[in-house]
């Protein structure tokens, strides 16, 4: 016991950013418990955090490059692996064009600071339009709504659940997930806190979920009818009359058009299709607009459906017209220590939509990516621009993308495939070469993305707990090497150096944030509750919110 040491870090296995207190001895984890000093999670953890120990100790985890041969998988050196990947990229692009090489980024990329900092330059170096990620099978409607309404793809409203009086949840199960595009560790307890202070939590879902069990009320809705439900709520609200002058009134564009659109969606007309009684719809609308503070939140169930984009747009409209947008207890916006929205926004890098289309199905791009639903057909369909090589980073699209069987057939047809992954799985088994990264406890970690989506502004750096084996490589080292092989240029900065440079642009000047200071405060630094700031963050050309 005397030799045991304590390490503090953030769990990076989901979006909740739970703080961990890890007891260890030498290179063995003794226990993992919640860090009560973490300003965001305050001691809460879920069972997933224990998997960090399992991942570190897993004998099946790859640590050295492997190559598929006629005699099975064989270990090879990093030099041989990089040489082969470089040769194949250059050969295939020279023969078939840049777009013959496709990439896919799985969700773990945004949970790893190395991938976030070095992945972009690698993708750019390939000069291909055939880029894909989990985004189009997940949260794309959120980004499109934010881009079109507020002018920036990452300006995503965050429900202020710790100060709201009324929480309306559609197609989300934060009781199990602890929030998605809403980083809120300990979400079930926060639901109970709303109720304890006299508030209500209404859950609209075709299923009775973990969230339904602890909500004030659960109502079943017919699948895919969420847009009708939201239009009907707005019909009632406009019929009742909204407060014409709010702090956002001078920034709104399109309010009269919205009023006209929703006139046709009376609950009496739509209730049967929605599957919720018209009186219930009216009551929810009136309660929402009459609550001191209220916020509507919708996630996967309203995003991954035919009307996903419409749903996320209408959720924003509902929060805006009831004077609950950019307001304490409503939908708010973060100001993280490393403020990606501000840093990219002032450079005009706010996101893009429909600049070009996919080759086979004529589907629009989003910020340089095409929908993953068309990836298999882009490989299988012959002709100019056909994908011949595929680079998959921390993803398993055979399981996670639409039509996994077709994806398998497509991967079998490739001339060459590379997986950057720690496991031999349903997708990586089709690769010619697998480049494994370090993982979890072997890595430096700072959440660049999820601080942008959290219910409180905090900053926390997790140092490496266990040094990697001599033959292992971090994700940033792999991506940096591949970029150099293609461009001849190598980024000389380490992740710590890059983070320090980014902290120099932090708006929290008084906090004097740096990698060194965060290392001195391993449980994290509290930067305060969310504050109204949208009017200073609108990136549309006319500085209006296009509702």
Language model regions located:
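N-terminal export/assembly segments and adjacent metallocofactor-ligating motifs
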Residues: 1-240, 254, 269, 277, ...
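N-terminal leader/propeptide and maturation segments of large enzyme subunits in energy/redox metabolism
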Residues: 69-74, 240-278, 465-534
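Generic, well-ordered alpha-helical scaffold segments in large soluble proteins
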Residues: 84, 88-92, 121-125, 194-197, ...
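Flexible, glycine/charged-enriched surface loops at secondary-structure junctions
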Residues: 96-100, 243-248, 295, 326-333, ...
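Conserved short loop/turn motifs at secondary-structure junctions
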Residues: 104-111, 272-276, 299-306, 338, ...
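Extended redox/cofactor-interaction regions of prokaryotic respiratory oxidoreductases
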Residues: 116-192, 199-204, 228-231, 319-430, ...
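Flexible glycine/proline-enriched surface loops and loop-helix/loop-strand junctions
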Residues: 172-173, 214-215, 265-268, 297-302, ...
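Glycine/threonine-rich phosphate-binding loop and adjacent beta-strand/alpha-helix elements that clamp
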Residues: 441-468, 478, 483, 487-488
């Amino acid at each position: 016991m005397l030799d045991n040491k304590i390490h503090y870090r953030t769990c990076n296995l989901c979006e909740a950013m739970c703080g961990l207190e890890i007891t260890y001895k030498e290179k063995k984890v003794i226990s993992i418990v919640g860090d009560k000093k973490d300003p965001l999670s305050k001691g809460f953890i879920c069972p997933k955090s224990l998997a960090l120990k399992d991942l570190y100790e897993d004998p099946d985890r790859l640590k050295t490059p492997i190559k598929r041969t006629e005699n099975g998988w064989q270990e090879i050196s990093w030099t041989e692996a990089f040489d082969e990947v470089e040769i194949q990229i250059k050969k295939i692009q020279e023969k078939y064009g840049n777009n013959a090489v496709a990439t896919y980024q799985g969700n773990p990329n945004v949970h790893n600071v190395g991938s976030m900092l070095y992945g972009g330059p690698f993708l750019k170096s390939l000069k291909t339009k055939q880029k894909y990620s989990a985004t189009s099978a997940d949260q794309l409607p959120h980004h499109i709504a934010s881009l079109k309404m507020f002018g920036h793809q990452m300006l995503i409203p965050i429900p202020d659940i710790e100060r709201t009086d009324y929480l309306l949840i559609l197609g989300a199960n934060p009781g199990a997930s602890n929030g998605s595009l809403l980083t809120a560790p300990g979400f079930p307890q926060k639901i109970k806190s709303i109720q304890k202070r006299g508030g209500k939590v209404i859950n609209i879902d075709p299923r009775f979920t973990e969230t339904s069990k602890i909500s004030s009320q659960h109502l079943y809705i017919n699948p895919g009818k969420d847009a009708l439900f939201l239009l009907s709520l707005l019909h009632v609200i406009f019929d009742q009359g909204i407060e014409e002058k709010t702090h956002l009134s001078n920034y709104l564009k399109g309010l009269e058009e919205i009023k006209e659109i929703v006139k046709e969606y009376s609950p009496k007309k739509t209730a049967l299709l929605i599957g919720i009684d018209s009186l219930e719809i009216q009551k929810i609308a009136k309660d929402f607009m009459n609550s001191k503070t209220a916020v509507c939140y919708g996630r996967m169930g309203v995003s991954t459906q035919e009307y996903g984009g419409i749903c996320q747009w209408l959720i924003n409209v509902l929060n805006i017209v009831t004077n609950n947008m950019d307001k304490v207890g409503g939908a708010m916006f973060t100001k993280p220590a490393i403020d990606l929205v501000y840093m990219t926004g002032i450079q005009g890098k706010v996101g893009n939509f429909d600049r070009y289309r996919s080759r086979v199905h004529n589907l629009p791009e989003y910020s340089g990516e095409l929908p993953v639903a068309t990836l298999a057909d882009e490989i299988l369909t012959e002709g100019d621009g056909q994908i011949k090589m595929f680079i998959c980073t921390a993803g398993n699209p055979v399981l996670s993308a639409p039509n996994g069987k077709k994806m398998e057939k497509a991967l079998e047809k490739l001339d060459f495939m590379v997986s950057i992954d720690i496991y031999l799985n349903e997708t990586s088994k089709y690769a010619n070469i697998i480049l494994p990264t370090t993982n979890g406890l072997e890595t430096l970690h700072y959440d660049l993305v999820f601080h942008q989506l959290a219910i409180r502004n905090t900053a926390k750096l997790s140092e490496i707990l266990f040094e990697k084996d001599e033959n292992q490589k971090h994700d940033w080292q792999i991506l940096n090497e591949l970029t150099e092989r293609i461009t001849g240029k190598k980024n000389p900065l380490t992740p710590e150096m890059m983070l320090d440079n980014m902290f120099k642009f932090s708006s929290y000047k008084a906090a004097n944030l740096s990698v060194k200071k965060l290392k001195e405060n391993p449980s994290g630094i509290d930067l305060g509750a969310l504050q109204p700031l949208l009017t200073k963050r609108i990136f549309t050309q006319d500085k209006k919110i296009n509702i």
